[in-house]
């Protein structure tokens, strides 16, 4: 989907900071747990991440200064199965892990939310996703007993017992030519299918907007696909027009 049906030009459309969360920590999480680099030619990196840096700068932040002040000691890189990324820093004397990723994954690892707060956050995610926005969640964790240097070693267990910070919603507009391309495929008897790592609600909104999903069509997530037998998948194949939250192995199975 990204860059083929959409422009791959992400922009931050909205933010939500948990009222009890320090605003500066939310901002730091968005730009420190981030692999964007800045050159004379502009931003280099994944558009989802460069949009966070652009927003931070637009809001008055100094990206180079903040990266120099709070260097990254260690990281747990993003992968499509875990759907999280974490980085480790010394924030004014405090050893802090920042984590960003998919809300549905990150929310289950947080410990500082009431049931009402969880419901409100999930409702906001539903609202943004239904508008075709990509939602990123951010959290932090104070770490005890880990050396504050590049000799620090992180493992996946650190991505538990997190403190939720907030959400950012990004828009990746559809390419103008996508609408006609999808229509032309249908006129030629070709059934277009969208395959994406995005949340199912977000992807469905975009798929409907550009004409890929029609009445009666089905959207399936990667985990749902994993639970399907081959016969079950073949039986639903003609109705499935969207595969969301897919992993690389899911994509191989779909193509086969």
Model-identified regions with their sequence ranges:
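Conserved cytosolic headpiece of P-type ATPases
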Residues: 1-256
